[in-house]
Amino acid sequence: MRLSNNDDYFQIGVAAEGATTISTVDADTAVGHLTLAPDGDLVLAPASKKTIINSFDRLYFDGGSDTYIHEVSDDKIQFIVGDDGDIMLQLEEKGADGNEISFGSSCVGFTQLEPAYDAANTVVDFRHSNKQNLTFGAGSITHLSLYFPLVSGNFQLLIKQDGTGSRTIAGLYKVFEFDETAADGVATVVWAGGSNPTLTTDANHVDILSFYWDADNEIAYGVATLDFQF
């Protein structure tokens, strides 16, 4: 299909076994863009289950300006965001040398959740965030139930005394795996030193409990950093 200028055109080429190429030709420059604008969804349904972008091409998300994903070299992908060309994320497969995720000059954070106080059994669900902030309610807590995800990781719980203070966790620090069943390895936290920490009881003071969750063996290792004062 050609316009009045015969040097600018659109063509469909069909090769062996029906392999088809759609192309445009701009004789003067390189702005023979191809726009697909359906009045509905654009559906890609290849029988091979593959949608292929050539090596080192860029997939843009802001109209072709400065936010894109691209393959830098074999087995290395970068996410570039913003007009400064910042590398927000880089993924690299290094064979026998392992795999690497680099955040470059980016910081990484979590939404801090606030578990609901329950005097009998307060639930802290690390499946939804690695960082949790719990304030005692009108009394102490008997048991603390910790839910961990399917993967291993580091998790932190900040525990704050209320304005009255003298609140304690007297019972068990129970450990549950991702499916909400008791951890098969050890069903309670394994604390440094062998016993539950003695929490600070002064009003408004803070303790931070840090856990390493070994998802393979289903064991939560805990250490307490005590008595942040205000």
Model-found features: residue ranges?
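Intrinsic low-complexity, repeat-rich intrinsically disordered segments enriched
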Residues: 1-129
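Acidic, glycine/polar-enriched metal-coordinating patches/loops
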Residues: 76, 135-230
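Low-complexity, glycine/proline/serine-rich flexible segments
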Residues: 126-130, 134-138
